[in-house]
């Protein structure tokens, strides 16, 4: 049986690792490959599309907590009925591509509705990087009062990185790292730093106060299970080393 409380424990211990399969990725075989690799590497949980059938397929094949992300109530609720263990209000890319921003008010309304429907399911909310700093902080304060379990930062994940050179890896993660740095000073909620992270920038996320990290395209651009396991195992060692270093300070 999946122990979703372990996810919250990993977050509390500042060692959470989330693997994002691609929130529009409905290639079942690819998602299963990522899920199997994630389980073998002992990451905290995986984040998949809010598709009930996909949730059922993954649940039938691996024993790892599943988070579903979205911006619509019904798909999220259906995914929970199918077995999803956690919920994330997020996946704003489709809005950004249309030059649209979800307002703080609409995010709060969505959170309230989800908490009414799924009061016992751990809930996280991604803070839109496109909001100004004042609105981001205001959103965090309201989410605290609504007792969401934790929040997530993001950046411009539309950017590409072809060569995985250090400069590009730093550039891709700059926005989410900056958001983490600012928000950790203004909220008591644990923060998952996500979007554009890599083995180079994961230590930076924890040094800035993150309680966990989200890894997406850095691993999910691969289709070979062994390759994904290798990368995630390296990330796991980095996270463990980062925590040991912080404990010695």
Curated annotation (Swiss-Prot):
Record's keyword terms, sorted: Chloroplast, Plastid
Keyword ATP-binding found: no
Gene3D superfamilies hit by this protein: Aldolase class I
Main location class: plastid
Pfam families attached to this UniProt entry: DUF561
GO CC terms in record: chloroplast
InterPro entries: Aldolase_TIM, Uncharacterised_Ycf23
Family per similarity comment: Belongs to the ycf23 family.
Name of the protein in its database record: Uncharacterized protein ycf23
């Amino acid at each position: 049986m999946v122990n979703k409380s372990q996810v919250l424990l990993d977050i509390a211990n500042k060692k959470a690792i989330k693997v994002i399969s691609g929130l529009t990725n409905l290639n079942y075989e690819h998602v299963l490959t990522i899920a199997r690799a994630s389980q073998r590497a002992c990451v905290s949980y995986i984040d998949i599309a809010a598709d009930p059938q996909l949730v059922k397929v993954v649940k039938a094949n691996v024993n790892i907590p599943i988070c579903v992300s979205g911006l619509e109530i019904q798909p999220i609720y259906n995914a929970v009925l199918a077995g999803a263990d956690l919920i994330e209000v997020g996946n704003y890319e489709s809005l950004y591509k249309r030059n649209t921003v979800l307002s703080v008010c609409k995010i709060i309304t969505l959170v309230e509705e989800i908490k009414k429907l799924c009061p016992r399911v751990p809930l996280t909310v991604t803070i839109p990087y496109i909001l100004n700093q004042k609105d981001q902080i205001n959103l965090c304060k309201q989410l605290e009062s609504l007792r969401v379990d934790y929040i997530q930062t993001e950046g411009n994940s539309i950017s590409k990185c072809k060569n995985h050179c250090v400069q590009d890896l730093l550039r891709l993660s700059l926005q989410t790292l900056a958001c983490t740095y600012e928000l950790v000073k203004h909220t008591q909620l644990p923060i998952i730093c996500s979007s554009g992270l890599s083995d180079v920038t994961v230590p930076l996320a924890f040094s800035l106060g993150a309680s966990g990290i989200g890894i997406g395209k850095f691993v999910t651009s691969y289709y070979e299970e062994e390759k994904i396991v290798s990368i995630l195992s390296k990330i796991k060692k980095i996270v463990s080393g980062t925590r040991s270093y912080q404990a010695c300070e």
